[in-house]
Amino acid sequence: MVNLVIMRHGEAEPMSAKDSQRQLTVRGLHDVNQMALWLQQHYAAFDWVWASPYLRTRQTAELMLAKQAPFSQLEIVPELVPDGDAALFKSYFDARLSEKPDARVLLVSHMPLVSFLVEAFTLPGQAPVFNTAQLACIDYRPAQGGRLLERLSPQELALLSF
């Protein structure tokens, strides 16, 4: 059962003076919408949707919420910033999961943290590079660890949808 989806934000504007304020591009909005529709068709809705405080991750999470978790609220988690600590976040996640062990959670974050999160929740040495709007679906239990069940990018989804 997939209970954890780790997602990189959609394509954002080029680097600017204030990285945290970069917005999604038109392509980024489209890609995130496509990924949200795919998740809606393949997996149950999320109980919790968490994103970094950066604008592009909040925009991504809000689009995902609209399609995938209409009864959930977006929670901003400062530890999900690009240079966040995956091991520290995993400890936080495990503590929260103890409150609701069957919760389904979407995390929206950045490279390189999304790669390190996959590694922290699955197997050491398994830190895949993420394209924008790409997601990883994980079956995770704190006592047993996690299994990466699938990864999907907007580009791969387009090939499946031809």
Can you annotate each of these PLM segments?
Residues Y92-L106, L148-A158:
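A polyampholytic, Gly/Pro-enriched intrinsically disordered region
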Residues V81-L97:
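Short phosphate-binding loop-to-helix
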Residues V2-L80, G84, G125:
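Active-site-proximal alpha-helix that buttresses catalytic centers in soluble enzyme cores
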Residues P53-Y54, S109-P112:
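Short, well-ordered beta-to-alpha junction loops that form the rim of enzyme active sites
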Residues T122-L149, P154-L157:
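Domain-level recognition of soluble alpha/beta enzyme cores
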Residues R96-P101, M111-Q134:
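Non-DNA-binding regulatory cores of transcription-related proteins
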Residues N3-M7, A103-S109:
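Beta-strand elements within well-structured catalytic alpha/beta cores of enzymes
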